[in-house]
Each structure stands twice: as C-alpha cells, then as structure tokens.
Amino acid sequence: MTQSELYHTLALMQVEGVGDVIAKKLIQHCGNATEVFASKKSQLQKIDGIGSVVIKNLQDKSVFAKAEAELQFIAQENISTTYFQDENYPERLKHCYDSPVLLFQAGNIDLQNQRIISIVGTRQITQMLTHFFRSGFIVPIYIWIFS
C-alpha cells in the first residue's frame, strides 16, 4: 500500500457513518480509498447500502487533517499497517465480514500464528487485563489489540 493510499484509507475510516463494513463496500466498488473520494455522487448512489448521509459525509474535508495526524503518529511510533486486501492479512480475519480494514501493529508479530488472543475496542488496558496477562497464563501466545 502506498503512502497516498494509506492516507486516503485513514481518511475514509474517519468519515462519520463509515465503519469497516461500509468502507470495504466503498473500496471494493470504487477500487481503492483514493477513488472513493474521487467518485461522483451518482456512482456512489449505485452502491447497495450506501445512503445519502454517508455520501454527504464523504464531502467532509476535516477527515484529511485527522488522517494526516494519524499518519504522523504511525511514522513517529514506528507502527506498521496491514490492509485487508494485503496478502499477509490474517487468514482467519479474511472470512469475517466486519474485520478491520487496517490492522496496526508495533513490533514483530506473526499474524498467522495459530494461538492468538484478540482484544477488540480498547487502547487503554484495564488493571484486571494487565493482571491477567502478567499471571503467565498466556505466555506462549500472541496478543492483538484492535481499536
């Protein structure tokens, strides 16, 4: 994925009313996130499940400033991304209709490992979860945090 495509994908994910399912519909219909933003309203209206509110929200230019800030954070923190159409996207997630468009990871993680715990929806780990991980119960497995 090019920097430009990552930028537009991050922007698409910032559009109000666009989650992973809608984003994938738009990307698959238009070809990529860059083309989603370049598409005419009449073309977007033909996509099943894409309503006038989402089409209107795609015109919100503030999503690009948010995407730029996200790109800077990714570079600053040395975070890598895996796109849902990438060859190395986890096989088990490819079969989930609502799997993330982008995975973010820090460090060297084998996303195809057979024993993995996924934590979805949080960037702040709770005290209870910290205790659970430190207890040694899950030492030989990888942990994913999706947010």
What residue spans do the PLM features occupy?
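Short, positively charged patches
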Residues: 1-134
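Phosphate/pyrophosphate-binding betaalpha-module
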Residues: 138-147
